[in-house]
Amino acid sequence: MSRRCELTGKAVLTGHLVSHSNRKTKRRFLPNLCNVTLLSDTLGRSVRLRISANALRSVEHRGGLDAFLVKAGEQDLSQNARLLKREIEKKLAAAA
């Protein structure tokens, strides 16, 4: 399982750990990933995702998982999230 957010694509970054004497050694900055279960109102079921804490705040801000996925770009989403987005869009188109 990769250390990548399924909704925003946020991943591991690399940088330097700098000591007092200014020696630099490599380090990794890990994203704050959480395993969450989100409810899709359109599909009427819950979905398990591994997303960053920042993405969780964005989902809540936009009004839920469905609204977030409809607005999200395809390039940042994982394969699982892309399939969810397509399902939601199909269901919304059928309801309209």
UniProtKB/Swiss-Prot annotation:
Biological classification of the source: Bacteria, Pseudomonadati, Pseudomonadota, Alphaproteobacteria, Hyphomicrobiales
Keywords for this protein: Ribonucleoprotein, Ribosomal protein
The protein, known as: Large ribosomal subunit protein bL28
Gene3D superfamilies in alphabetical order: Ribosomal protein L28/L24
Gene Ontology cellular-component annotations: cytosolic large ribosomal subunit
Entries under HAMAP family matching the protein: Ribosomal_bL28
Family: Belongs to the bacterial ribosomal protein bL28 family.
Organism: Methylobacterium sp. (strain 4-46)
KW Ribonucleoprotein (keyword) present: yes
MF GO annotations: structural constituent of ribosome
One Pfam family here: Ribosomal_L28
Gene name of this polypeptide: rpmB
Regions that span the bilayer: none
Any GO BP annotation: translation
InterPro entries xref list: Ribosomal_bL28, Ribosomal_bL28/bL31-like_sf, Ribosomal_bL28_bact-type, Ribosomal_bL28_sf
NCBIfam families membership: L28
